[in-house]
Amino acid sequence: MDKIGVLLMNLGGPERINDVGPFLYNLFSDPEIIRIPFPVFQKPLAWLISTLRSTTSQQAYLSIGGGSPIRRITEQQARELQSKLRDKGLNATTYIAMRYWHPFTESAIADMKADGIDQVVVIPLYPHFSISTSGSSFRELKKLRDSDDEFKKVPMRCVRSWYSQSDYLKSMVELISEQISLCESPSKAHIFFTAHGVPKSYVEEAGDPYKQQIEDCSLLIINELEKCLGHSNPHTLSYQSRVGPVEWLKPYTEEVLADLGRSNVNDLIVVPISFVGEHIETLQEIDIEYKEIAEQAGIKNFRRVKALNTHPTFIEGLSDLVISCLEGPLVNLEEASQLPEKVKLYPQEKWQWGWNNSSEVWNGRVAMIIFLVLFIELISGSGPLHKLGIL
């Protein structure tokens, strides 16, 4: 019987306060996160941004216990999935590849080679595909695989996205229903989906399918929820976690919360739709920051749906994904990372800083200049900002 390696790809997160700076550096060193015209500046810019953001980010992690639980939860998911697959008769072993913190993809590849894996199934722990999440992880894996003659021989199948998988939808409905049942008027509870945002240009200029998949997913969940409960609930979708000067997907979560408060919404069921495990954006951004905004807006009951973590129905769905991937049409690593064709005035492969026709580029260029000036001053210890007493 073939030895199957199931590779679960995720973001990663700092486990201790001292990890925050290096984690941010790894994050912003990724050109899928920040696109600049000259690659030589990528790492200096990443160092600058991570240095400037470290203190604030450390405070956020301190508020949830001093570190991210994402590794612990992902390891639990991997163990549960491995057990489920073996119960179904597969000789499967799960591995974890984090993009920006330990255990990195290189470590997972080394472990699979040492274990003599015969074929690999790759599942990103992002239900919806995006350039900056699954896409970045797929491309990192491809780069490492292409440079490893031994690992390159191992057959590999990939799951690109899985937001419409039946058990995933069912598990989301089960968790949402739990919170709705706690409301005084369940049919009036407002379902508030909040997804991690991406820059608008990713969708409009590069063809990222993320926005469409998020919208489709939220409607699928609402339809299944209505079947389960026997009534429909009002619902809204928003996007959170934007950073930088460019425009991100709208509407923004904090703005929608204020609008819902003005509309006299009392019971709000917050659904973190793009996260399958608890981490900084659920535990701190939603549970602390957005809850405070909601309460200030007059929303009386703010209820956040738990992340899927190791929900049994969710783990069952992941196991079915693995089996379907093994039995279905081959999707290789190259295909998994591809973007759909889009008609535009410039080549899609040249979609990067300075090549699209959006005014956001100019905002980005200005920000780039500011970052570089600040970087030079931090290194040199002199300049106009020092003379003004800003630095």
UniProtKB/Swiss-Prot annotation:
The keyword Lyase applies. Fe cation binds at H196, E281. Its EC number is 4.98.1.1. Pathway: Porphyrin-containing compound metabolism; protoheme biosynthesis; protoheme from protoporphyrin-IX: step 1/1. It catalyses: heme b + 2 H(+) = protoporphyrin IX + Fe(2+). Its main location: cytoplasm. One of its GO terms (biological process) is heme biosynthetic process. Keywords: Cytoplasm, Heme biosynthesis, Iron, Lyase, Metal-binding, Porphyrin biosynthesis. Signal peptide: none annotated. It is found in: Cytoplasm. Catalyzes the ferrous insertion into protoporphyrin IX. PANTHER family: FERROCHELATASE, FERROCHELATASE, MITOCHONDRIAL. This is Ferrochelatase.
